[in-house]
């Protein structure tokens, strides 16, 4: 995208996990006056889980990854993401240095948000990175059979009954500056990313739904490119949108951006072998989204499907083309939001 082709500059907030928010904020760079990432803090993965114990703090992993993605110093970025091999200290195997740094800063300052801010300043991050909450709480879920699971790792584990609802083990409020960023944004983008453990996890904190309802701009959801084993097995696009609307309440979500690309079968095969299936809406789904009071914006968002990446303790998915995503989100900006037109 040519930055000169955009004659307006808007304030953008992206809500979710580190990967999705990073992708969105890169995509909107040509037309963003400011960019804020509001990041999930309930991860309990191996590196993050241990760092949480060390720092007695919320999950730092997605925050660290987001800061590194926008670092002005590449050496600092690589250092934040550097994972120890455990040589001599097996307990540190796979530990990201940035997670330890945030844990240490939290212990020194007594303030998790300040620790994140110090880390972002050290990296020279070009976007504002905020935790959705500073509460050290646990993500829990009720399954359709009525049983409960505790901890983000268990919530996303495959091979269990479908998820019915999320809740926090210890109810907590959102971080006030994150709520301010949501309310003042011209565009709030929810997703893409793990529907339950990244996107809906952020909504569990007190104040997030209300802030979205009172956002001065447009609230958009970017639907995922594929299903995700353990979270959205068997889901269609409409199922994703319905979950978001159910969590936010009627009249809050303005736009659902949905991918309609149809990649080559050979490119899809490695993903399908891992249980991920392409999401493409049919006309009935598009009509159903509209019936929810949400504007469906269906666009081709994937170009060349890159080879699957080996992610630490996570599963890769098909990534959207940054340019195509940016053009589509600019379309969203040009639409009239619920309060700005």
Where do the model's predicted regions map?
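An anion/phosphate-binding loop that grips the pyrophosphate of nucleotide cofactors and donors
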Residues: 185
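Electropositive, gly/pro-rich neighborhoods at or near active sites that engage anionic ligands
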Residues: 42-161, 316, 320, 324-335
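Structural motif
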Residues: 13-14, 189-191, 220-222, 257
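Conserved phosphate- and dinucleotide-binding cores of soluble alpha/beta proteins
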Residues: 2-9, 26-32, 36-58, 158-160, ...
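Hydrophobic/small residue at the entry helix of a nucleotide-binding pocket
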Residues: 20
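Glycine-rich oxoanion-binding loops at beta->alpha junctions
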Residues: 166-179
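C-terminal functional extensions of proteins
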Residues: 2, 234-341
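Glycine-rich beta-alpha junction loops
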Residues: 41-45, 135-137, 145, 225-227, ...
């Amino acid at each position: 995208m040519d930055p000169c082709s955009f004659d307006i500059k808007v304030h953008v907030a992206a809500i979710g996990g580190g990967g999705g928010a990073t992708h969105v904020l890169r995509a909107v760079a040509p037309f963003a006056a400011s960019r804020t990432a509001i990041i999930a803090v309930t991860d309990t993965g191996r590196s993050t889980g241990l760092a949480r114990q060390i720092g007695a703090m919320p999950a730092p992993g997605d925050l660290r990854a987001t800061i590194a993605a926008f670092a002005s110093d590449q050496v600092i970025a690589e250092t934040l993401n550097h994972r120890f091999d455990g040589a001599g200290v097996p307990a540190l195997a796979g530990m990201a240095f940035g997670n330890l740094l945030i844990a240490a800063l939290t212990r020194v300052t007594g303030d998790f948000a300040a620790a994140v801010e110090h880390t972002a300043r050290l990296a020279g991050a070009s976007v504002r990175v905020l935790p959705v909450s500073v509460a050290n709480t646990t993500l829990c879920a009720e399954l359709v059979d009525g049983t409960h699971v505790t901890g983000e790792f268990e919530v996303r584990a495959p091979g269990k009954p479908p998820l019915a609802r999320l809740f926090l083990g210890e109810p907590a409020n959102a971080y006030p500056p994150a709520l301010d960023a949501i309310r003042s944004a011209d565009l709030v983008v929810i997703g893409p990313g793990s529907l339950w453990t990244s996107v809906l996890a952020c909504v569990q904190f007190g104040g997030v739904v209300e802030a979205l309802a009172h956002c001065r701009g447009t609230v958009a959801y970017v639907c995922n490119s594929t299903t995700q084993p353990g979270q959205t097995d068997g889901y269609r696009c409409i199922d994703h949108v319905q979950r978001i609307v159910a969590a936010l309440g009627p009249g809050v979500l303005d736009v659902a951006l949905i991918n309609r690309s149809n990649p080559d079968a050979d490119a899809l095969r490695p993903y399908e072998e891992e249980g991920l299936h392409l999401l493409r809406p049919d006309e009935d789904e598009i009509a159903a989204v509209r019936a929810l009071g949400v504007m469906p914006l269906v666009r081709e968002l994937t170009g060349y499907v890159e080879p699957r990446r080996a992610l630490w303790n996570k599963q890769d998915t098909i990534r959207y083309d940054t340019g195509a995503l940016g053009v589509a989100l600019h379309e969203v900006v040009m639409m009239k939001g619920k309060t700005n037109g």
